[in-house]
UniProtKB/Swiss-Prot annotation:
It comes from the Bacteria. It is an enzyme of class 1 (oxidoreductase). Changing L320V: 2.5-fold increase in activity toward hexadecane. One of its GO terms (cellular component) is extracellular region. This is Long-chain alkane monooxygenase.
Amino acid sequence: MTKKIHINAFEMNCVGHIAHGLWRHPENQRHRYTDLNYWTELAQLLEKGKFDALFLADVVGIYDVYRQSRDTAVREAVQIPVNDPLMLISAMAYVTKHLAFAVTFSTTYEHPYGHARRMSTLDHLTKGRIAWNVVTSHLPSADKNFGIKKILEHDERYDLADEYLEVCYKLWEGSWEDNAVIRDIENNIYTDPSKVHEINHSGKYFEVPGPHLCEPSPQRTPVIYQAGMSERGREFAAKHAECVFLGGKDVETLKFFVDDIRKRAKKYGRNPDHIKMFAGICVIVGKTHDEAMEKLNSFQKYWSLEGHLAHYGGGTGYDLSKYSSNDYIGSISVGEIINNMSKLDGKWFKLSVGTPKKVADEMQYLVEEAGIDGFNLVQYVSPGTFVDFIELVVPELQKRGLYRVDYEEGTYREKLFGKGNYRLPDDHIAARYRNISSNV
């Protein structure tokens, strides 16, 4: 195996992201999430560890399915309170040079015209280190609070997202020509008006004449992430995504998703290798196996079953408080689900516990056997999870030639796909909008 493994830190601008209850752990600093220094320190730590990116999750609603109430989520800080992730990026970019930032933003609630400007602005300010994790959202409470009168079904949300990205692509890729900005001081011409174009988009969901408000940024289009593993989500990923955050924690599940999405990508004329696949991973590492187990046991003491049941309810729509332990949801009994939720076992992602060698072995195995390209690293305590990984696992991966020793120059897209590849490839669907002046 010669390819380098890509590593992102999986974070959220809140107290309780995934490991619910652990905000109480004495080594956890997640209560500092409202302190900008917390985020700049974290960004510098991740860059020290040669991480590819900080992947920022987000929700714009409350988990209120469990017990038909928001109280459990609010009481236990299950992704609430939660602040806007976009506001963090400029400060973190200022104190780093190479670390990229993948930010989650929903296509369901806000207009693409304004969003396109925000992403272009961040791409300028980060010098091409921005990515967008495209989500369609799923929480009914978000629909209510954004005043959505006609609730879109799951697949129609992806129809809207398709058009949303089409609008953004037109603005980013085609509205301004590469040489539109000339900065001619003598003739008082900053931008050549003939090289700035309307997009004249008219669709089912959006009417956007254009032009884009921003001059071309280093990447133009941010690196596109996607994380939905439904049938429709995988189709969307095959069409749009450059990076996919996969569900699953075993080789069989991950390999199925990898092969399926890459096969679908060929239908759109895309090179399947132009899509990087990321799996979630939870790592508890120690210099010895016993030390790692001590950490796991320490985390388990603060693990909250109620918090995870609230999260499960919001994510699946099932209120387990209504069921007996002998009832079944699909092929799994409710008792089994609750038992699984009570244990710190990775839940949705692979859990790796042990020495640096054991963790590196398991990561390498998943990359080689499932065909993935990297991982989103979940944290249990902040910044301890990342510190341990950087100090113990990174040197082991570097020793095997599986992880960068230093960064290469360039944008985030170039760091993923090679020097010179700062724009979307020609086989991406967005490329058709580059000569928009001759297409509209």
